[in-house]
């Protein structure tokens, strides 16, 4: 079938901010889809609220709207643009839910707008738990015993009928939001209540648990002519019971017999045909390991997280194909862009093994509940490729950028036996390391299988690696043992640990004996057809398939897995750096380990190496490619941390030198620079012992800001108000050394701001000053920010510009840098300097039109700012107002305190743009799904000492019709000042009743000292999040919301 000519203009719905369950994979799929539609000649409109994406670049679609993803906002854009059709299946669950909601308003029928790809009936049939169960029964496909419920009592009643354990699956949610496994009535009442509240249709499926079955995923495609094919079959290392987003996954499947594979494949294809899905679809199946019995778990009728993984694992661009299918093309008409000779209907074949491991945020949230179940908790993931499953697993572990670089964990090694077995029986994020430890202690495969229900095949992979560890440790500097270990993915650092030497010595010995990796190509067809894909992975094997070209090359280091503090913003900068390198006439090479991102789309760079971002793996690529130099400024702290090791190995670091990168992080050197430039900074001291930290704090005076050096995202950063709190901080953050000291700064009250600047060594371009809406003490990544600034006069701006110019030149910055300031008593103080791209680069780039990463890259490559047409100083401010708002995933992470602090907690961001500050704020709040009705009900729970600051806010809310609720200690103060209290709430149970009944629309909680889990302030915050009620812990955020509500309020005025 040829592509459709009756439609010309297509609106694509993006996925919005990154949250747990919906991350960078949708930037990748949305970008692919928009470009595919433009390639076919269609006019495209993109709507997305997330500025930190490649998808929202103006060249990706004909019309780009960075607007809230709400029915109201989309309706306005649809009436403005009049598209012929909407493509909703590339925006994750948000895209699907919006398509359903838009249809229910009648707008699509009114304007004659068609939904492309999967039709509404199919979406409904796949997403509505009851309808899906009915369809499975019609098709004769087995599903676990289940019942759809709309109340908690119905859920408990069914659990009694079928027996515990049961799984709760809310309808129309993603990442298992609100779901969980329940073992008794108490757990059922808690989980079902939460699931029903989070389901947009107040519906859950209660399902008899089949935990322990093998979990198999098929990524399948179908077109309008009913051609179907399997892109990839993936097998979860973890059995059913752990959300697939929190599972280790292998591709292709590792343990299925041909009979099992064909049986499950037939089921997957039957389902996509029955649902009449046009495009990509993810089918999840559970297989009884003791028989040929299986159950259908669910179908995602859209491009998903697994689609991105399958695309990168096979090289088959699922989202691109899905977009082309949506406009009428069929699989037998679309050329495979990898081989350029075969068609899209040919199923990919893999002659390698891929391993995905999730990246969890528990290094940031040490108090969080780390248990894994049916609700996803990972913020991102890594992927590794090897010739064996062992090699892929080892490479994936070291891609995670956590304390463990292999399967050895000191914590697991010292754990008592009962703790070890508990960790296996009740899985947490670190189960893999405890699993390895059981084999070191002599457990059999059967014993570990009984504890974990993990397939003996996967257990044997871990056991084999432990056995190889033992062999290695007894044969230091043995060439044959070295070769074997490298084939199974052992790093030089791991071998060095086992040989009691340094990784440099292992590398030297390896090179002397010519034990070197080769690089293999990903070609989708296991070399069956000719292919020249520039997409490679390393292996200790024969025949190198990556040939160095004569063209000079530049290597760009990516940022690895998405995590809190290092999100998709850094991938955005990486991709734009690649574009600038290519336009400058160089070959652009990328190393990255993240399957979700645009930078790991092999069509973006000239060569892509899917490798761990470790010194060894990067040096191996450099040995082969011999690039002119390496750019580390756009890969976040991941790339910066590699700079010193690379430089010591003779690698040319382009842009700011390693010594100058260190100058910004070394407290003594930096302090001297500030003094020499006659600039101001808060009084600060450095300490390398616990006692020295306490003395420094006493010398400066409380409150103080304490943090380790060399961190990203404010990890382990805290404001402490007395010695007791400082002692507690030091107990929780014990790792303090001469090389990595603790920094202690005076805490200044004032307005924070930040700038991103580009310096060529002489001139300094400042695209804009971003004012933080929250005062000092909230991490910049968790602060709302406004550009242009709303509260700085020309003198303050001049001080900021002068300080930026002086610092950039003095620190010998060549490229990009970020500086954070605080304005205290009309004076500008420097808080910190980051000699790299920051998370605000996409935000400012979208607003100003300056592609900052590209401009900085050209500077790094030797082109001055003047030659690029830029003048020194602050770029002219726009007429429009732009607000960036953080987005959090607290509802996915039990026991994480939501009180905003110097340590970053947000997972994503949105942007609001309009002609006034209040309108821009309104859009930002709306995009972040903070929607408080006019004339609503507000609960104030206030820290002692905050009453004076809170009082005027409460009065203003009351004046525009809001009902005020308080705790007893706040009530008397409010009453004394003439504020009517609608109700006093005296305990947490009373609050829970009101929250459940929908009687509270916003909770304001400033009880910062209540961080213990049994404290009132903490419990109030947890209850508020559990009920999905907006929560604000900063009075500056409250004031911003109040400005919006006052702007929207109509005042009743008497005639005088």
Curated annotation (Swiss-Prot):
Q: Where does Mg(2+) 1 bind?
A: 284, 298
Region entry Oligomerization domain: which residue ranges?
Answer: 402-546
Instruction: Kindly give the InterPro entries that the UniProt entry links to this protein.
Output: ATP-grasp (IPR011761), ATP_grasp_subdomain_1 (IPR013815), CarbamoylP_synth_lsu (IPR006275), CarbamoylP_synth_lsu_oligo (IPR005480), CarbamoylP_synth_lsu_oligo_sf (IPR036897), CbamoylP_synth_lsu-like_ATP-bd (IPR005479), CbamoylP_synth_lsu_CPSase_dom (IPR005483), MGS-like_dom (IPR011607)
The residues the record assigns to binding Mn(2+) 4 are 832, 834
Query: Which gene holds the coding sequence for this protein?
Result: carB
- Residues bound to Mn(2+) 1 are 284, 298
Protein name, entry field: Carbamoyl phosphate synthase large chain
> What organism is the protein native to?
Limosilactobacillus reuteri (strain DSM 20016)
**Residues involved in Mg(2+) 3 binding:** 820, 832
Primary enzyme class: ligase
Q: Which residues does the record give as Mn(2+) 2 binding sites?
A: 298, 300
According to the UniProt entry, the note on domains is: The large subunit is composed of 2 ATP-grasp domains that are involved in binding the 2 ATP molecules needed for carbamoyl phosphate synthesis. The N-terminal ATP-grasp domain (referred to as the carboxyphosphate synthetic component) catalyzes the ATP-dependent phosphorylation of hydrogencarbonate to carboxyphosphate and the subsequent nucleophilic attack by ammonia to form a carbamate intermediate.
**SMART domains (alphabetical):** CPSase_L_D3 (SM01096), MGS (SM00851)
